[in-house]
């Protein structure tokens, strides 16, 4: 499989599929959150700057997370490379942490309930995950392990001609499309949204479990490999922590609702 990672080129300007995924995902989230914000969790004033907060949190968190979790030695040796975002190198777990941190500060500034705001935003986030994984697939990166199944595909970036799991598509479906459906069914057709932080916890647990198991068929990052027992990857460790935090948030959400 070999698709040009550049979606559009105008003179010297190149717009890559990955950048396009970010742009469309953020714009969709901005539109969708306003559409479903029936209880006015966000104020009209806060909507004017929320995109800049989202972008700051995701880019800083994603980049710092990738540096710390996946390639610290390289960036310590060549620190200038930290700023070359166009070369790639983003971490979903880092981007999530960055987004949660900036949203916490944002909510404090505009006097918005943090958990309610996160619950609302996470109803839209899976679409961004879906688009991001499709961009990974187009770029031929984050491909899976060698397989004999009929789902196997050849990725030129792997450096060989073995059939591999299209793990990006597995993630696009289970972490993106399916999670979007689940989150919104719960939001619109159950009383879950009355429990502040409940959707937050469900997102954390769902994503963490799905990512943990898909990592078994995803090729580990070559510079990291396996970090525990010769089968646990960094992505699995971070996803496990994500599940634990999700369970803690779930318990706190239920306790606070009962008080």
Swiss-Prot record:
<feature type="transmembrane region" description="Helical">
    <location>
        <begin position="50"/>
        <end position="70"/>
    </location>
</feature>
<dbReference type="InterPro" id="IPR001640">
    <property type="entry name" value="Lgt"/>
</dbReference>
<dbReference type="GO" id="GO:0005886">
    <property type="term" value="C:plasma membrane"/>
</dbReference>
<keyword id="KW-0997">Cell inner membrane</keyword>
<keyword id="KW-0472">Membrane</keyword>
<comment type="pathway">
    <text>Protein modification; lipoprotein biosynthesis (diacylglyceryl transfer).</text>
</comment>
<dbReference type="Pfam" id="PF01790">
    <property type="entry name" value="LGT"/>
</dbReference>
<feature type="transmembrane region" description="Helical">
    <location>
        <begin position="10"/>
        <end position="30"/>
    </location>
</feature>
<keyword id="KW-1133">Transmembrane helix</keyword>
<comment type="function">
    <text>Catalyzes the transfer of the diacylglyceryl group from phosphatidylglycerol to the sulfhydryl group of the N-terminal cysteine of a prolipoprotein, the first step in the formation of mature lipoproteins.</text>
</comment>
<feature type="transmembrane region" description="Helical">
    <location>
        <begin position="197"/>
        <end position="217"/>
    </location>
</feature>
<feature type="transmembrane region" description="Helical">
    <location>
        <begin position="169"/>
        <end position="189"/>
    </location>
</feature>
<feature type="binding site">
    <location>
        <position position="133"/>
    </location>
    <ligand>
        <name>a 1,2-diacyl-sn-glycero-3-phospho-(1'-sn-glycerol)</name>
    </ligand>
</feature>
<feature type="transmembrane region" description="Helical">
    <location>
        <begin position="86"/>
        <end position="106"/>
    </location>
</feature>
<feature type="transmembrane region" description="Helical">
    <location>
        <begin position="112"/>
        <end position="132"/>
    </location>
</feature>
<keyword id="KW-0812">Transmembrane</keyword>
<protein>
    <recommendedName>
        <fullName>Phosphatidylglycerol--prolipoprotein diacylglyceryl transferase</fullName>
        <ecNumber>2.5.1.145</ecNumber>
    </recommendedName>
</protein>
<keyword id="KW-1003">Cell membrane</keyword>
<comment type="similarity">
    <text>Belongs to the Lgt family.</text>
</comment>
<keyword id="KW-0808">Transferase</keyword>
<dbReference type="GO" id="GO:0008961">
    <property type="term" value="F:phosphatidylglycerol-prolipoprotein diacylglyceryl transferase activity"/>
</dbReference>
<feature type="transmembrane region" description="Helical">
    <location>
        <begin position="227"/>
        <end position="247"/>
    </location>
</feature>
<dbReference type="GO" id="GO:0042158">
    <property type="term" value="P:lipoprotein biosynthetic process"/>
</dbReference>
